[in-house]
């Protein structure tokens, strides 16, 4: 099976469209190796016209590693596989949820820049998202190239240089990030299960060797720093990483499939008229194999 990749951002090795692969069909191991290499180069891969079911999505995803089990917040809608996270504004009766519905509020946290599962002790490697139903406008997924942002960061306005950040540890928490946008929606049981974790502020990709600032909305503070100083640094670095020149915005068409490397990018979902148009996305997540600390 031969395929080509069309760069989606002229002049950058970031975001590419894969042409010539049907992920529901048998794919030999050499093609998976080529896709791994392509993901290392582009960090985001787009596959158009992939009308797949959950079994097919899981089978394709498992070729890249073991899959995470979804959080309970991302179940429902008839999904029976724990490997599938359903991110949707549609309830179990196939009706559009109200804007104030608990799950709608929870999923609005995805509108903040983040790296999937950075709130877990061993964060995710790869995410694969299938657009089962998409709105006619809005609801784009934006991706920021954390590699290029790290390479080009000129240093902080507060006098902090890149070398000063080596070895620093940050606390990541999904409880913290969700409170930023929707308030306290977690039970005491959830808070016990989702305790904060420690992540390196700078991490090196184990396959490509490239470094990134490992941040996003789950990142709460820098260990050992004054809280206000650490929040200012996180805000400054995140603003730099998500400058327009580092960002690819994916406009979804029905049954698009998008794969990205969480070790190389931040991403977020854009809003849409969510009480008018349906948006149903199914995600599989390739588990990480080592902690960052």
For each feature predicted by the language model, list its residue ranges.
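Fe(II)/2-oxoglutarate oxygenase catalytic core
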Residues: 2-259, 263-293
